[in-house]
């Protein structure tokens, strides 16, 4: 039987030797694929798709059928936890995620209940079990969650935001309430990731999409501290499950992030991979960091930029190729194939 620990992805995460650089893509199950759009249409809306284990399994497997990827990522959404807390998640056409019951005052934070994760989010774990059963046995499955800070941003703002005025006002004027909210979320995220691991995921990733809007000190206090808490708890219970942290626009804080005990850091395209490796490569693996916009260009440009990312990381293991953020819906599927082929062709020279 194939030992999953021998997969390229898990070996690279643990900084063990590999024959070539592994690759997967953030949002690899998504709207750029015509087969995904068909299933989403059948589901009625995005949330129905997330909450139907059979359909979530199908869209998770779609990119694996089309491309030679080195891992699958569970199809879900980062806002499942706030939804389970009773905030009433819905997706407004053209506006992204919204909540019918956002946290409008400190009283709402004090009365917010930590949900029973195994029951309230059973559809996520059912999907994970089904995916693990149906997907190729030699490929790892990645589970994920939003970071407490990122979830809090959506919960206080009521959805996406351009300026994060409400949540920033909260951390400056109501520190105690902000920490109470973040702690409730850290407890929930930890339980959520543990249930995903029990359901069969082989690595987990924490997406801190909005950590980059904070000052350095506030990042430490209101985002990193809670991710650290989660990593420590996960490592206590599941020391062999790799944990990846990703703060968008967080390249200036890699050293702090590497101190959490995580196994890898995702880096976006604004961060130089060579200098990131010099700074933290002795402690963690690095994942990234092709600019997603490159996938809207030409074959030659894609191959050239893939080559630049691989050269920037340089020789040896500890690199997982990915985009610097999620793939966009307007990417031609054939351009994804060009990127993957380029990684397969160019990367072996860095692993001789």
UniProtKB/Swiss-Prot annotation:
Molecular function in Gene Ontology: uroporphyrinogen decarboxylase activity
Domain of life, source organism: Bacteria
Transition state stabilizer, annotated site positions: 77
Family: Belongs to the uroporphyrinogen decarboxylase family.
CDD domains, sorted: URO-D
Transmembrane segments: none
Enzymatic class: lyase
Residues annotated to bind substrate: 27-31, 77, 154, 209, 325
Gene name per UniProt: hemE
Enzyme Commission number(s) from the entry: 4.1.1.37
Localization in the cell: Cytoplasm
NCBIfam families referenced in this protein's UniProt entry, alphabetically: hemE
Name of protein: Uroporphyrinogen decarboxylase
A GO CC term attached to the entry: cytosol
Biological pathway: Porphyrin-containing compound metabolism; protoporphyrin-IX biosynthesis; coproporphyrinogen-III from 5-aminolevulinate: step 4/4
Role played: Catalyzes the decarboxylation of four acetate groups of uroporphyrinogen-III to yield coproporphyrinogen-III.
Pfam families in UniProt: URO-D
Catalytic activity annotation: uroporphyrinogen III + 4 H(+) = coproporphyrinogen III + 4 CO2
Keywords: Cytoplasm, Decarboxylase, Lyase, Porphyrin biosynthesis
One of the protein's GO biological processes: protoporphyrinogen IX biosynthetic process from glutamate
Species this chain originates from: Legionella pneumophila subsp. pneumophila (strain Philadelphia 1 / ATCC 33152 / DSM 7513)
Summary of subunit composition and partner proteins: Homodimer.
SUPFAM superfamilies: UROD/MetE-like
């Amino acid at each position: 039987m194939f030992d999953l620990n021998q997969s390229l992805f898990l070996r690279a995460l643990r900084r063990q030797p590999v024959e070539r650089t592994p690759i997967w893509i953030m949002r690899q199950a998504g709207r750029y694929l015509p087969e995904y759009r068909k299933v989403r249409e059948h589901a009625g809306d995005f949330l129905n798709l997330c909450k139907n284990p059979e359909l979530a399994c199908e869209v998770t497997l779609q990119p694996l059928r089309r491309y030679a990827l080195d891992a699958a990522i569970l199809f879900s959404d980062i806002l499942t936890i706030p939804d389970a807390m009773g905030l009433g998640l819905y997706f407004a056409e053209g506006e992204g995620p919204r909540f019918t019951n956002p946290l409008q005052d400190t009283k709402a934070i004090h009365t917010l209940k930590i949900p029973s994760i195994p029951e309230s989010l059973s559809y996520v774990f059912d999907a994970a079990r089904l995916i693990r059963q149906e997907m190729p046995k030699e490929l790892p499955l990645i589970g994920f969650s939003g970071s407490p800070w990122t979830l809090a941003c959506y919960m206080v703002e009521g959805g996406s935001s351009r300026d994060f005025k409400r949540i920033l006002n909260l951390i400056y004027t109501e520190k105690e309430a902000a920490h109470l909210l973040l702690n409730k979320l850290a407890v929930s995220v930890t339980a959520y990731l543990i249930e995903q691991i029990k359901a069969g995921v082989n690595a987990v990733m924490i997406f801190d999409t909005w950590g980059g809007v904070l000052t350095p000190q506030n990042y430490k206090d209101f985002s990193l501290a809670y991710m650290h808490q989660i990593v420590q708890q996960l490592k206590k219970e599941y020391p062999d499950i790799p944990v990846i942290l990703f703060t968008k626009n967080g390249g200036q804080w890699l050293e702090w992030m590497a101190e959490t005990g995580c196994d890898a850091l995702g880096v976006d395209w604004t961060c130089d991979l060579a200098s990131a490796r010099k700074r933290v490569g002795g402690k963690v693996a690095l994942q990234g960091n092709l600019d997603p916009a490159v996938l809207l260009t030409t074959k030659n440009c894609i191959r050239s930029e893939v080559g630049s990312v691989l050269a920037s990381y340089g020789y040896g293991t500890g690199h997982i190729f990915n985009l610097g953020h999620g793939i966009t819906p307007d990417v031609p599927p054939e351009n994804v194939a060009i990127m993957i082929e380029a990684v397969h062709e160019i990367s072996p020279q860095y692993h001789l």
